[in-house]
Amino acid sequence: MSDNLAKAISNPLFPALDSMLRAGRHISTEDLDNHALLSDFELELSSFYQRYNTELVKAPEGFFYLRPRSTSLIGRSVLSELDMLVGKVLCFLYLSPERLAHEGIFTNQELYDELLALADEKKLMKLVTNRATGSDLDKEKLFEKVRTSLRRLRRLGMIINIGETGKFSISEAVFRFGADVRVGDDIREAQLRLIRDGEAVVHTKEPSQGSLLSEEDQEEQAQEEMTEEGEA
């Protein structure tokens, strides 16, 4: 073990940071201390995670995350279609002028309204149930599912909750859901096409669409959903 690697893993921040990365969290520049640790020891920690057949990735936007290979010793699961669609709409909002106008802060309702405005409503309703007709009850169920998706994406470091008011800011990590853009193309228009063409609701096992949610996180989510249903 190199001196630098020993220094990295002996850092008091490392145990919690390692757990977050293994659970699928993206470490963005907003997380100053953890991001600095990864930046300072990127080479050494990349070698460390290779032992688990997992790649420590630094995205062009500056955030870090783990990408397990098929033979990885670190498990991963795939996000739902709605999770991915919400992620793509979050990316669209991140690129929008509204983000500056709102000082980077959005509400759950604003995200939901944007989702309804940008995506095919019939496809959205099918994510609630195949028998959905677009009734007020179906829309309420969709809103609850969107809130669940936002909680999952928060665990992955895509959004940052602001208090308990249903408000959040969007991390640059949402570019995991960004459209591939050629030089000279309008990235926001490309993202809009990605949403409207229906690509955002196609289930895929591409690494760029994969979550790294641990089994523990999935169990916690299931318990949350059951609690919400009980309260309803």
Swiss-Prot record:
The gene is mukE. Interacts, and probably forms a ternary complex, with MukF and MukB. The complex formation is stimulated by calcium or magnesium. This is Chromosome partition protein MukE. Involved in chromosome condensation, segregation and cell cycle progression. May participate in facilitating chromosome segregation by condensation DNA from both sides of a centrally located replisome during cell division. Probably acts via its interaction with MukB and MukF. Keywords: Cell cycle, Cell division, Chromosome partition, Cytoplasm, DNA condensation. The keyword Cell division applies. One of its GO terms (cellular component) is nucleoid. NCBIfam families: PRK05256.1. Belongs to the MukE family. Gene3D superfamilies: 1.10.10.2250, MukE-like family, C-terminal domain. It is found in: Cytoplasm, Nucleoid. It comes from Vibrio parahaemolyticus serotype O3:K6 (strain RIMD 2210633). GO terms for biological process: cell division; chromosome condensation; chromosome segregation; DNA replication. Residues 214-232 have a biased composition (Acidic residues). InterPro entries: MukE_C, MukE_N, Scp_MukE. Residues 203-232 are annotated as: Disordered.
